Amino acid sequence: MIYFNSERVEVKKFPNGESLIHSENLKVRSDDNEIRVYFENDEDITHLMFLKSHLDELRIKCNLILPYMPYSRMDRTEGITIFTLKHLCKLINNLNFESVTIYEPHSEVSTALLDRAKVVNMSKMLAERLLKELDNGKEEVYLVYPDAGAAKRYGKEIGYEKILTASKERDFKTGFIKKLEINGCVESKSFRAIIVDDLCSKGGTFMLTASKLKEMGATEIYLVVTHCENTVFQGELLTSDLITGIYTTNSILSKDHKKIKVYEI
């Protein structure tokens, strides 16, 4: 789904599936024009290429906003798999945007490969906002990082002392987590916890983390992620009593639930 200057770009289909993009409704500004891509599927990349090429012909400069950077998971070559993120970044660079803004990239490789890239640390902002909401002086609040990568990333971004970090052991053949432990000390018998990460799919890791936190005395457990996929409805996060609420954005998520608070970006 593509927006140009906050207006959704109209795309129709020919009978054979080819796209027909209407340009007469594009509201062009004198400066600071922007294309915003809410990635749903690979068609969005094709439409982005067509729209930017059209604007180039009109000599209209433009910035690109990516609430979610597509193909961030494929940030390296493993065996015979294709380094998809590298090739997508090359395509975006060739479109020659004035700037490319990414919200909470899943991989730092994205910003390394993109020209004129800017990053919005959205999970940091969401976590800090929730910390203020929960700070009532009655129960201690701990930030919980679900793995070493999250601890390294958000430990630098968020200035907060009460930290717990999970360490996990995976079965490399199946991908399932065999063991998970919480590292760090809790000073009181009861506390509230905020798990912070960038992305949630079905939420298996977060369920295991929350289960361990409950054993340690957590009374309320919140999950903060910038990107929440619709597959969260296929997992147990929303049906279990372990998670009190999920704080996320509309970068990917397109469904509603009473336990999910969505911030628009």
Language-model segments: which ranges?
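PRPP-associated nucleotide enzymes
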Residues: M1-I265
